[in-house]
């Protein structure tokens, strides 16, 4: 039995989306984000894709985003020889600026990998989120991830904002919050994600 590994999952019977599907999606996401915590992070580390995710707790999200998300991946990309010292300096500089770029809010429970491939429609026509990489973070991280690869209509963002308003200026921070998943894709797949991540970092420094 030691040669086998099992994964037991709940079966979700598929169905068709209801007319108010995206409003329901926004309500469920807002309900998820309404679960708050005293620190950013999680009591244990986990994974995003096959990459480890460091979740040690931080009081300020700017510190968490730098030390637990951006810089570990920059180190990995340097180890993979995608980045050199010159590129690393850009990310170090950005990390020092994050406290001026990201507004404070309560740590919210995030899905953590909310792209269009990570939700299903169940037999009642309701949205179901799957395959999370959860931690307590900044809500704008989930919102930005939803916009990275598309697949979500504008009405879901409008409905979310009505349920749980985002902090003023959030649209200007979308690229900043997309930096982490772009770095993840750079480490996993290389290619255009490497210059894209560097371009995002430079745009905020």
Where in the sequence are the language-model features?
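Hydrophobic packing residues in well-ordered alpha-helices of helical domains and bundles
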Residues: 22-25, 87, 91, 197
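ATP-binding pocket architecture of kinase catalytic cores
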Residues: 1-63
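Generic structural signal for secondary-structure transition and capping sites
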Residues: 34-38, 70, 103, 165, ...
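An alpha-helical support segment within catalytic cores of ATP-dependent transferases
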Residues: 37-109
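Active-site Asp-x-Gly
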Residues: 61-66, 75, 106-109, 116, ...
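Short, solvent-exposed loop/turn segments at secondary-structure junctions
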Residues: 2-5, 12-15, 115-116, 133-136, ...
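C-terminal alpha-helix
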Residues: 28-32, 199-204
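Conserved PLP-binding active-site segment of the aspartate aminotransferase-like
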Residues: 8, 180-187
């Amino acid at each position: 039995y030691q040669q086998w590994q099992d994964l037991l999952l709940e079966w979700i019977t598929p169905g068709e989306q209801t007319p108010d599907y995206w409003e329901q999606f926004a309500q469920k996401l807002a309900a998820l984000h309404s679960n708050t915590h005293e620190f950013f992070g999680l009591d244990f580390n986990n994974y995003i894709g096959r990459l480890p995710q460091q979740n040690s707790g931080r009081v300020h999200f700017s510190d968490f985003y730098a030390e637990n998300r951006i810089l570990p991946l920059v180190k990995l990309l340097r180890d993979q020889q995608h980045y050199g010292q010159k590129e690393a300096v850009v990310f170090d500089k950005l990390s020092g600026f994050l406290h001026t770029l990201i507004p404070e809010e309560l740590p919210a429970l995030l899905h953590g990998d909310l792209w269009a491939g990570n939700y299903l429609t169940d037999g009642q026509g309701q949205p179901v989120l799957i395959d999370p990489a959860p931690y307590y973070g900044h809500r704008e991280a989930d919102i930005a991830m939803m916009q990275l690869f598309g697949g979500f209509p504008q009405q879901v963002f409008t409905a979310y904002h009505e349920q749980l308003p985002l902090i003023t200026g959030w649209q200007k921070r979308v690229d900043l919050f997309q930096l982490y998943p772009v770095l993840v894709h750079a480490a996993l797949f290389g290619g255009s994600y490497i210059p894209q991540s560097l371009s995002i970092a430079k745009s905020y420094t």
